[in-house]
From Swiss-Prot:
GO terms for molecular function: structural constituent of ribosome. The keyword Ribosomal protein applies. The keyword Transmembrane does not apply. InterPro entries: Ribosomal_bL36, Ribosomal_bL36_sp, Ribosomal_L36_bact. GO terms for cellular component: ribonucleoprotein complex; ribosome. This is Large ribosomal subunit protein bL36. Pfam families: Ribosomal_L36 (PF00444). GO terms for biological process: translation. PANTHER family: 50S RIBOSOMAL PROTEIN L36 2 (PTHR47781), LARGE RIBOSOMAL SUBUNIT PROTEIN BL36B (PTHR47781:SF1). Keywords: Ribonucleoprotein, Ribosomal protein. Belongs to the bacterial ribosomal protein bL36 family.
Length: 41
């Protein structure tokens, strides 16, 4: 999982990327290509 300051550019890298809030953290998840997982930090 990558840790980035800004997830906006990561979200646009693949069409299946979703921005999700879990436990106060912001994540990008992708069900089809797991390598696009990222967390804002």
């Amino acid at each position: 999982m990558k840790i980035r300051n800004s997830l906006k550019s990561l979200k646009d890298r693949h069409r299946d990327n979703r921005v999700i809030r879990r436990r106060g953290r912001v994540y990008v998840i992708n069900k089809t290509q797991k390598r696009f997982k990222a967390r804002q930090g």
